[in-house]
């Protein structure tokens, strides 16, 4: 409690001390953390830069859920008893700093999360859209199209991670839970973007393949390669279309974390967990890791369109990989589709549904399937405050008779409120 009080005092002092900078909070080439950031994917690129000195933007978010879920299985493994109540409130602290013309820093700290009730740093990066800090006019024409990102940061694999809940930053997610196979990781690396004038863009990146950074055990983990090719165009005032294909691959890793890197935890607390489970330690409830521990190649295709208030976002994911103990590679597939309708003044209300299915050949030889149906609705009280309600129903099929997931299912209602600024 004393440590938390000291940290809270520090944050208050920081916010108060920087309040003068907070009057104009707009930054160049920046995804807004409020309603304006919805359906923004990569940070926008604008060659008209407004830098007039170092500017510090202090932001953050806080989210609270009420959970009313129940679960069941065959009884081979006893499930923990769960009831209806509130989950731990989560919070983020964001620092975004304009350091020079076209140069910006981002840093996110998780103040409170399911897995880590204590504060810890998620990661951060430098984003470079202009090279005048080297020499005025240096590569000026090229930098109208190029963006460079370097840091210990969230990899840009696929488009689904732009819509996922990141601890308390849940403004961009129209639902409460993320995908069953939640493709997300933070690694030290660099990404180079090229954006043309016709809507086409591409990205190539390299990372060190490590979630937990260390200089010990050299040679156990090789580099990870990332790539993305896409088209994103506002065809008319009413219609926007986007289509991307992405790849993430590493052929040698001490541990692949692509589907287990989110250490903040899932939104469905303690579902399908045994009687010894604790919310902070068994924090991936409701998610699925295909178990490609040491070698993986993943491809994701994401179509998106928005026509007036109607929007669709899809995910088609094909993954191959294995653990060192396996002699041959296995395959996993994930498909998801979201249909959202936004309505009312400034589209302040929405209703939507998502279907998500995962199939995988497990190391045991079992062919398993997990299906999830979500039905949700939301209302923006202001551009910084969103309330959501969701019905979720998840079914497990094909699991071994001794598995806790054998004939497993969970379903019920979730309520969530988020403040983000």
Q: Where are the regions that the model predicts?
A:
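Glycine-centered small-residue hotspots that permit tight backbone geometry or close packing
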Residues: 36-37, 60-62, 92, 264-266
